[in-house]
């Protein structure tokens, strides 16, 4: 019996050692530890077999220098000796797929594209950081990693409409996405509380629409009056700054998807150009959170001229295939009372105001399609009918995504109870001294995020409609970037693992690897939330 017990203990220890060698987040498809180690030092180089790989190689070297102190150089001529990191493109692999082979002689990394190589380097970055050594020498354990993502769309959304974040802060957000192999940055640029992007044809959007007179303090209910801080608040991105951010993201293989929310969430635009509203104002940039009854008028041609003018400049700034046009939380009260909207309903043979919104969205989609772009919209675009070519972002629950999938639309799953990273992170916000969050009732610990199943209740054919997942960071109660990081991390890692490792998830193993990744968060100076790491849910 004693002999059996000893064998059991030996097996457990052996397995734990093997598992401990995998430190990569998100979890790779296949990880096999090998015998031995390879030494990297200041003489080691990153050899690129294709000029297109200089960029990801250079980024990798900057990561290793900042996080480990080890200075590596990039070369295009084949070097001799050991400790070489060799990068190449293998067209037989999928675009985002990579193979990483660490041997005693060196490191060989192949990707299906530049992007695949970049993801392999993000994995190697984590491996090197956790390896023994210092700025002079690092010993990396030998291993073989075969990896590719399950979902092609893996997104992170940042709302800069409620609170503004600087160019450097947005770039840091992008860096966080890149570390987790997130490949879409959904940039929520316009809101009732502020218009955040320069549109040259409509200068009042930033002259007037980017600044609110004051901001709501704390919460309020229907039984109490809102309290304001009395301080003007504003900010916007110039077009040159937008180009800089898009370039920065592109260098990290992240597609920036701009969102111009319409027809609702447009009070800042209405304050800038009152003639675009059903009542023609006066309007002011909204000081309080919540949903406004005032939305763009769907009955006047002037509204569509405005939208096309704005989107023409957006198209020029963002090379993304997708443009997000919102479509959420658009009350129909003003449309019901607006003679122009009612006339439009009659002339177009529409059934009601929901079909009027469908007309509105389809018309905008047609304009974007003429410029080679596709739309994403929040799941409200399903109401009143939606074109088959629209991609639906399901936020009000997985059932909305299921509905869209059954209709044949492409779907991005981002349901509130799994993916809204502005929610509280523990069961007792006060006891755990959590900062302000969107909902005091809704709790979203990292375990809950990790449990998301984007395919739930879908058959094999319907599953093909689900193109990915996304974590959303709304900022009504997040006034600065330090707070934003606290809400984002470590829960974004769970979103990333759902998107990348859907077929290979294991929460216990995720927890172990996250305790390793936490050290890299510390080194990068990220202000992550501590609850999960302290065993608090």
Each language-model region and where it sits:
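Bacterial Sec-dependent N-terminal signal peptides
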Residues: 1-23
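Contiguous, structured surface segment used for ligand recognition
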Residues: 20-153, 483, 495, 499-528, ...
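Flexible loop/turn segments at secondary-structure boundaries
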Residues: 54-55, 164-166, 192-198, 263-269, ...
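Residue-level detector of anion-binding/catalytic polar loops
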Residues: 71, 183-184, 255, 374, ...
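Feature activates predominantly on carbohydrate-active enzymes
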Residues: 93-294, 298-304, 309-322, 363, ...
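Flexible, acidic glycine-rich loops studded with aromatic residues
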Residues: 374-380, 385-390, 396-537
